[in-house]
Amino acid sequence: MKVNLPAFERAGVMIVGDVMLDRYWYGPTCRISPEAPVPVVKVNTVEERPGGAANVAMNIASLGANARLVGLTGIDDAARALSKTLAEFNVKCDFVSVPTHPTITKLRVLSRNQQLIRLDFEEGFEGVDPEPLHERINQALGSIGALVLSDYAKGALTSVQTMIALARQADVAVLIDPKGTDFERYRGATLLTPNLSEFEAVAGKCKSEDELVERGMKLIANYDLSALLVTRSEQGMTLLQPNKAPLHMPTQAQEVYDVTGAGDTVIGVLAATLAAGNTLEEACYFANAAAGVVVGKLGTSTVSPVELENAVRGRAATGFGVMTEEELKQAVASARKRGEKVVMTNGVFDILHAGHVSYLANARKLGDRLIVAVNSDASTKRLKGESRPVNPLEQRMIVLGALESVDWVVSFEEDTPQRLIAGILPDLLVKGGDYKPEEIAGSEEVWANGGEVMVLNFEDGCSTTNIIKKIQTESEK
């Protein structure tokens, strides 16, 4: 099915709010500290990602939309790191620097897919003059289709009513991800996007769908909102609008690893889609699909147009089944951040038989994820002769992708997958047959990266060549 994504390249969005830097330290935990009963993490990977309002801007820019970010920062390394990273993603930063305050920074230490501790470095910006923020909003109103106010209660949005009034006077939609229980400060917004706990903290505990709808409609009337979108985790999301039936959308997430930043993704996709000229219902549809993508990643993350298109077509955004090489690299990177061991093998897999299935199941048991690289049709002909393959590449990959033991399937055009393996660098490279490890394509690259290479036995009596010969013999009778 062809999916028509919104014309994101025509969308202009301004994001105003609490800007943060998210830092991540990853590493294995092998012992307990002699100083205190706490684990010792040997840090081997350090990452810095924009968080808060900056993550909203990243999500918008990653879709190909024009994102302009306004917020309060210090004059420090964290602010410079934010500006550098955001510029690489084509986010236009227009920060207001506050010399007396540090840039808000959150440091997370993770090991084996578990967050061990979070350290926050911040001082509230509540006393800072908001007028420079108002000036920046005024300057941008003629070139944007949506204004996002990203509220983390850190002080950047002390004058929300002024910001809403400026945008509404220019007929620009105002989308707000709320914080706290004082929804009065968001009066007149186009759309609020509270999660279920935030919604119930204001409206009260809801025992049924009807009660949620009833209380949501009261909030819309009480605070003069155009719409309310309640995000409900595994229950999806619910859109409420005056004089319209509620729109319930089930979740599209297939695996949930981390909900960090999921709300930023939702409001970012909503804003970009509305600014591109789509309806609110369409915006919610794409935002729901994007949320299913981002919770399958670790930490604050963004969604690309390819991932979004795959998600609305029903393909798992975390990457399962048939993939392009670039999609595979992204999926492997996410798996590594989750501490998963990646196993890789390759072959023609022309006529899938019991020996193949047994071999792949055994390979999968050696790690957490299994990649199968498949020779293209041209590569197979060079390797096996003009009569092969019997089954074309697309069919071979679909069948492999349907196996429970196989996570990712990718093709390669060369005679060997050496280039592909060098780009993926699995933790374990396996091959079936009577090879010596050093004879296996890609073994040198895997060893050089600290990985392992292993030879597994094929099941006796199973051979694609023998199956083909038997079919030919039977057909000649």
Curated annotation (Swiss-Prot):
UniProt-annotated stretches for the region Cytidylyltransferase: 344-477
GO molecular function: ATP binding; heptose 7-phosphate kinase activity; heptose-1-phosphate adenylyltransferase activity; phosphotransferase activity, alcohol group as acceptor
EC number annotated for this UniProt entry: 2.7.1.167, 2.7.7.70
Organism of origin: Salmonella arizonae (strain ATCC BAA-731 / CDC346-86 / RSK2980)
Any one GO cellular component localisation term in the record: cytosol
Protein name, entry field: Bifunctional protein HldE
Catalytic activity: D-glycero-beta-D-manno-heptose 7-phosphate + ATP = D-glycero-beta-D-manno-heptose 1,7-bisphosphate + ADP + H(+); D-glycero-beta-D-manno-heptose 1-phosphate + ATP + H(+) = ADP-D-glycero-beta-D-manno-heptose + diphosphate
InterPro entries assigned to the protein according to its UniProt record, in alphabetical order: Bifunc_HldE, Carboh/pur_kinase_PfkB_CS, Cyt_trans-like, PfkB_dom, RfaE_dom_I, RfaE_dom_II, Ribokinase-like, Rossmann-like_a/b/a_fold
GO BP annotation list: ADP-L-glycero-beta-D-manno-heptose biosynthetic process
List of catalytic residues: D264
UniProt keyword terms in alphabetical order: ATP-binding, Carbohydrate metabolism, Kinase, Multifunctional enzyme, Nucleotide-binding, Nucleotidyltransferase, Transferase
General function of this protein: Catalyzes the ADP transfer from ATP to D-glycero-beta-D-manno-heptose 1-phosphate, yielding ADP-D-glycero-beta-D-manno-heptose.
Family to which this protein belongs: In the N-terminal section; belongs to the carbohydrate kinase PfkB family.
Pfam families associated with the record: CTP_transf_like (PF01467), PfkB (PF00294)
Listed HAMAP family: HldE
Subunit structure as annotated in this protein's UniProt entry: Homodimer.
Coiled coil region boundaries: none
Residues the entry annotates as binding ATP: N195, L196, S197, E198
Pathway: Nucleotide-sugar biosynthesis; ADP-L-glycero-beta-D-manno-heptose biosynthesis; ADP-L-glycero-beta-D-manno-heptose from D-glycero-beta-D-manno-heptose 7-phosphate: step 1/4; Nucleotide-sugar biosynthesis; ADP-L-glycero-beta-D-manno-heptose biosynthesis; ADP-L-glycero-beta-D-manno-heptose from D-glycero-beta-D-manno-heptose 7-phosphate: step 3/4
Ribokinase: annotated segments: 1-318
Superkingdom of this protein's organism: Bacteria
